[in-house]
Curated annotation (Swiss-Prot):
Keywords: DNA damage, DNA recombination, DNA repair, Metal-binding, Zinc, Zinc-finger. The keyword Acyltransferase does not apply. HAMAP family: RecR. It comes from Neisseria meningitidis serogroup C (strain 053442). May play a role in DNA repair. It seems to be involved in an RecBC-independent recombinational process of DNA repair. It may act with RecF and RecO. This is Recombination protein RecR. Belongs to the RecR family. A zinc finger (C4-type) spans 59-74.
Length: 205
């Protein structure tokens, strides 16, 4: 393999390493597989990624991904705007919707605090959350972060952020397994955690 081709192959490996839980060895295996067995599928993947990069943006209200100004949930006038559930990632919204346990709205942080990886408060979209709360309709904030070190750290920062604001604040009950990500929790357990959520502070100034 020429040096130029070697650079191209290594470039593919390096690009694949940005994916979650994909290290150098996994990236190398994926690269070999795509080039040897899945060239047409790889071209479709490139096209789909380019299209998504052009068309998918953040919802102006909840910060999740969508193709218009507002996602379908935020645009739904039948949702209860008095309750705002704060979650880590868009997948958490999908799981909550599948569990059919929350008829309010959401805000997606798109990150969580992980001091070991140097991810501090700047990793979560507090500025956008503050803007979202400016409308005045919200009465209760439901913190729906995972019961992991990162999720607990994020929940603590959120609790401090809301401490002097006039909202009732609650967090999912610990029916969710310790160390469990919401993405992997079954619908029944998730619904119970919402219904039995723990009060952090009452509403009012």
């Amino acid at each position: 393999m020429s040096h130029k081709k070697q650079d191209a192959f290594q470039g593919l490996i390096d690009a694949l390493k940005v994916l979650p839980n994909v290290g150098p060895k996994s990236a190398q295996r994926i690269a070999y597989h795509l080039l040897q067995h899945k060239r047409k599928e790889a071209e479709k993947l490139v096209d789909a990624l380019q299209t998504a990069l052009k068309q998918v943006h953040h919802c102006a209200m909840c910060n999740t991904f969508c193709e218009g100004g507002l996602c379908d949930i935020c645009a739904d006038e039948t949702r209860d705007g008095r309750r705002l559930m704060v979650v880590h990632m868009p997948a958490d919204v999908s799981n909550m919707e599948a569990a059919n346990c929350h008829d309010g709205l959401y805000f997606v942080l798109m990150g969580q605090i992980n001091t070991a990886l140097g991810m501090d408060v700047s990793a979560i979209a507090l500025d956008r959350l503050a803007q979202r709360l400016g409308g005045g309709e919200v009465e209760e904030i439901i913190i729906a972060t995972a019961f992991t070190a990162e999720g607990n750290a994020t929940a603590y920062v959120l609790s401090e952020f809301f401490k002097n604001l006039p909202y009732k604040v609650s967090r999912l009950s610990q029916g969710i397994p310790l160390g469990g990500e919401l993405e992997y929790v079954d619908a029944g357990t998730l619904a119970q955690a919402v219904y039995e959520r723990r009060l952090i502070k009452e509403g009012g100034a």
